[in-house]
Amino acid sequence: MKGTQTKEKQRVALVIQYLGSRFHGWQWQPNQRTVQAEIENAIAEVLGETVTLHGAGRTDAGVHAAAQVAHFDMVSPIPASRWVDILNARLPEDILIRGSAQVPLTWHARFSAQWRRYRYTFYTEQRPNLFVKPYSWHYYHFPLDESLMQQALNPLLGRHHLAAFHRAGSRRDHSWVEVQSTHCHRQGPFIHLEIQANGFLYGMVRLLVGLLVEVGSGKRSLENFTEIWRKQQREAVKYAAPAKGLCLLRVGYEEFPFPPSLWFDSQPLFLFNQVLDSSLSFPNQSLPYGMTS
């Protein structure tokens, strides 16, 4: 019909940061506060219709994300680049949209992803610290040896059947995972463990960390740790590490429309760096609030 504007479907990708403490995970659940539901509701408010947001990873309740990736489809003249401001004006304080861009309809936040990277953080001082408590496991009961923990992680590199670190309730029909890299290092009173894989099993990182601390504290041998996951002894993995220490750090794609500056590779290290910084100096004379010398 003459004068009618044709509207074509477009796919919008988002880079999302959130604090997981007050969420019941990423994925929509009835009568629960979830990240997916909050963002879907905000988008629906603008478009006047329901949408489905597809995430690269389904983080558990209490798990944080520095750069979760998701996409949704719309038939709207709104430019994809505007969704950062549109959504941030409507979302709660514990969710932040860091980037938005149009992607091909063949691109998928979950199925186009080649890898995901998680970081788990321990805080090992005996006295608690309120500024890092929401983002780390306060583990001070026994000294942790990060070099032993790294040695335990090394055999995980490659493609393995990791049923020992697979929680019940998953819809995934297999437990094969290709672990691409692991890194465990100390930063003052903090120990950071990073693991990158093509995908992760339900609850995998927290179960792995829960067993790994037994190696780091000298309660379990390297050989026994390896034997447990190689023989798929799920019953031997009794404890999952607290969710608050875990952060989805980054998702990797062959083609991605966002600049590298959106990746928070330093997250959550930036916070811990400030806590550790003893070189801060303060002027003798106080300045008015908001002013610097």
Curated annotation (Swiss-Prot):
The active site is at D60 (nucleophile). CDD domains: PseudoU_synth_EcTruA. Substrate binds at Y118. GO terms for molecular function: RNA binding; tRNA pseudouridine(38-40) synthase activity. Pfam families: PseudoU_synth_1. GO terms for biological process: tRNA pseudouridine synthesis. It catalyses: uridine(38/39/40) in tRNA = pseudouridine(38/39/40) in tRNA. Its EC number is 5.4.99.12. It is an enzyme of class 5 (isomerase). Keywords: Isomerase, tRNA processing. Formation of pseudouridine at positions 38, 39 and 40 in the anticodon stem and loop of transfer RNAs. Homodimer. Belongs to the tRNA pseudouridine synthase TruA family. PANTHER family: PSEUDOURIDYLATE SYNTHASE, TRNA PSEUDOURIDINE SYNTHASE-LIKE 1. This is tRNA pseudouridine synthase A. It comes from Rippkaea orientalis (strain PCC 8801 / RF-1). The lineage of its organism: Bacteria, Bacillati, Cyanobacteriota, Cyanophyceae, Oscillatoriophycideae. The gene is truA.
